Amino acid sequence: RYHVRGMAINIVTKDYAGTNQLSGQIIGGLQQSKYAKGFGDFYLSMQRGKFGLDAQYQYVDGNSYGESSRIANHPLGNERVHYNDETCQKSFGIAHNYRLGMNYAFSKNHRLEVAYTGKWDKSCSNSNTAGSSESGMHNDSHEYLHNVDVNYSLPFGLNINGSYTNYRTPQQQKLDGTIYTNENTTETERNLTSGSEQTISKWMFTADQTHSLAHGWGLSYGVKGQFTSNKSYQNTLDKEGNILPNATSSVDINERIWNIYAGFSKQINKAISIEASVAAEQYHSPIWDKWRIYPSLNALWNINENHLLNLSF
């Protein structure tokens, strides 16, 4: 019923519906080395009767710098090849992380929750190498994330969830490089430009029903649907602008998951409880279309305040 496979931790926090509370926090800082890096974090939580709101924003902005050097003397046949280089790299980055959540309690066990989480990152780096090889590399990348979650709980034990996630990471990279021989003549030259992007979209919904029966028995059943699209590509061009087939590829995958389950729980006494369920799941992709059965069993025995025995299958 938690829609996870394997071990899970279920955390239930205190419900402040019906109260009036307001809290917030602001954090900021600055780090200085060769270049400066600053960050800020804002958090707000508010509860006004049946309505609750929480908001968070985080900002990071700064530069970084690094240097490295290498010296080597490699055996090659009856000779030795000397190699040395020095590399310096400077990077710039800016990141925004934000969240806005709202909830409304219509009555006891009747609640609506909506939350949005987003991310926007940009990074840029320049690397230059001089010595036995000379190269320059420039990289620009972005990261975008949008996620919306909706949860609706009804008094008779029905819980409906829906979520949408969109993730995108475009990137551009340029490399110019030359490796020299001992006679300081051109050995190998590379001038490449590459672009890549991955876009993932995921829809998911769940519907779960629970019943509390007599004598400590409980019944639960539900369904889950998940639909995912993964589109990615990478293309690489030489200095004349020609596409390199061996370094160019694309992926377009659509996945679908259907899951239905049913289970029961039993509180035998204050110390012993048991929970069991069975799920049937279909996974569909361009190369796979199968049904699988997943049984599970969890037994718990609270021996005393300091000892707990748990059996899971």
Feature names for model-found ranges:
Residues R1-N126, M137-T169, D208-S220, N298:
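Membrane-proximal, glycine/serine-rich, low-complexity loop/turn segments characteristic
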Residues N97-D121, H138-K290:
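Face-selective signature of the C-terminal outer-membrane beta-barrel domain
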